[in-house]
């Protein structure tokens, strides 16, 4: 009986501390467009995958697309889609 209570307590602790980690990593990242002076982006290749499932060469080009289209595109992940 004591072993079952101990297992339950450990499970509750694990869920309590792991929950915020999963929520933090499951959210999409908002691009920080204020750092770029648009129009005109650097030519560095650091691809990002937008929530519109388009791969952008870098975060600046994603910001340019947001500015032109008015869409609320977030960064799904770093790297190609």
Curated annotation (Swiss-Prot):
Residues 1-21 form the signal peptide. It comes from the Eukaryota. More abundant in epididymis than in testis. Disulfide bonds join 33-63, 41-60, 49-81. GO terms for molecular function: serine-type endopeptidase inhibitor activity. Residues 27-81 form the Kazal-like domain. It holds the Pfam family Kazal_1. It is found in: Secreted; Cytoplasmic vesicle, Secretory vesicle, Acrosome. One of its GO terms (cellular component) is extracellular region. Keywords: Cytoplasmic vesicle, Disulfide bond, Protease inhibitor, Secreted, Serine protease inhibitor, Signal. SMART domains: KAZAL. GO terms for biological process: acrosome assembly; spermatid development. InterPro entries: Kazal_dom, Kazal_dom_sf, SPINK2. The record marks 43-44 as: Reactive bond. PANTHER family: SERINE PROTEASE INHIBITOR KAZAL-TYPE 2 (PTHR47608:SF1), SERINE PROTEASE INHIBITOR KAZAL-TYPE 2, SPINK2 (PTHR47608). Strong inhibitor of acrosin in male and/or female genital tract. Also inhibits trypsin. As a strong inhibitor of acrosin, it is required for normal spermiogenesis. It probably hinders premature activation of proacrosin and other proteases, thus preventing the cascade of events leading to spermiogenesis defects. May be involved in the regulation of serine protease-dependent germ cell apoptosis. It also inhibits trypsin. This is Serine protease inhibitor Kazal-type 2. It comes from Macaca fascicularis (Crab-eating macaque).
């Amino acid at each position: 009986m004591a072993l079952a209570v101990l297992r339950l307590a450990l499970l509750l602790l694990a869920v309590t501390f792991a929950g915020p980690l999963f929520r933090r990593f499951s959210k999409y990242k908002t691009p920080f467009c204020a750092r770029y002076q648009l129009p005109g982006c650097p030519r560095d290749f650091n691809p990002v995958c937008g929530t519109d499932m388009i791969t952008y060469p870098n975060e600046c080009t994603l910001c340019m697309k947001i500015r032109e289209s008015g869409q609320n595109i977030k960064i799904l992940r770093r790297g190609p889609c």
